[in-house]
C-alpha cells in the first residue's frame, strides 16, 4: 500500500479529521528536493538510501507537522555525516526553544552548525502551527530580535540538509513553549532499516 494512503487510513481510524497537507513520501532518488513533486511514489518506499516522510494531521481543528528521516541499507560515510549533522542541529537548537529567546537565535545556531561542515540549510528552521499549518512566527534569521518564543506557542523544529547525490535528511518535531522551557509533543526521529 502507498505510504501516504496508509497514513490517511490510520489517522482516520484513530479519530483525526484529515491530513494537515498532502503527505510527502520521498524516496532516495527524490529526498534531496525538499518538497518533491509529486509527494507520493509508486516505487519501493523506502528504498536503499535516505528517504523523507513529511506529514501532518488535523485533530480537533489543530494541525500537526512532522518529518521522519528514514535510512535504509548501508550508507556512505557522507550520508552518515548528513544524518549526524541534522540530529546534532535538532538537539542543540531545541535548547534555544524557550521563553524570551529570539527565534532567530535558534536558526542562526543551526546555520552555524551546518556551516562548519560546508553545508547550508535551504529553508527556515521552523514555523508556528495551530489552526493553520504555517503560522507566525517563522524561525528564521530574517526575524527581528523582538520576536521571541513565548509560552503557549507551538513551533516546529525542522533542521534539514539536502544533496542531489546523497539524498535529503530532515527531522521535524512540534515543540510547545512552556513557562520553564519546552515540551516536544511529537516523536519524529531517524529510523534505520
Where are these regions (language model features)?
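Active-site neighborhoods and metal-handling regions in enzymes and metal-associated proteins
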Residues: 1-193
Amino acid at each position: 500500500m502507498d505510504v501516504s494512503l496508509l497514513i490517511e487510513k490510520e489517522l482516520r481510524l484513530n479519530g483525526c479529521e484529515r491530513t494537515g497537507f498532502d503527505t510527502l513520501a520521498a524516496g532516495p532518488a527524490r529526498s534531496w528536493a525538499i518538497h518533491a513533486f509529486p509527494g507520493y511514489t509508486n516505487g519501493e518506499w523506502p528504498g536503499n538510501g535516505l528517504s523523507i516522510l513529511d506529514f501532518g494531521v488535523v485533530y480537533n481543528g489543530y494541525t500537526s507537522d512532522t518529518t521522519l528521516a528514514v535510512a535504509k541499507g548501508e550508507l556512505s560515510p557522507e550520508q552518515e555525516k548528513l544524518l549526524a549533522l541534522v540530529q546534532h542541529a535538532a538537539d542543540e537548537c531545541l535548547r534555544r526553544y524557550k521563553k524570551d529567546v529570539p527565534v532567530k537565535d535558534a536558526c542562526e545556531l543551526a546555520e552555524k552548525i551546518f556551516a562548519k561542515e560546508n553545508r547550508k540549510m535551504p529553508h527556515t528552521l521552523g514555523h508556528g502551527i495551530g489552526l493553520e499549518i504555517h503560522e507566525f512566527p517563522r524561525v528564521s534569521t530574517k526575524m527581528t530580535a523582538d520576536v521571541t518564543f513565548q509560552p503557549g506557542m507551538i513551533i516546529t523544529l525542522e533542521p534539514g540538509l539536502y544533496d542531489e547525490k546523497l539524498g535529503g535528511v530532515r527531522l521535524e518535531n512540534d515543540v510547545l513553549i512552556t513557562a520553564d522551557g519546552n515540551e516536544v509533543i511529537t516523536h519524529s526521529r531517524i529510523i534505520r532499516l
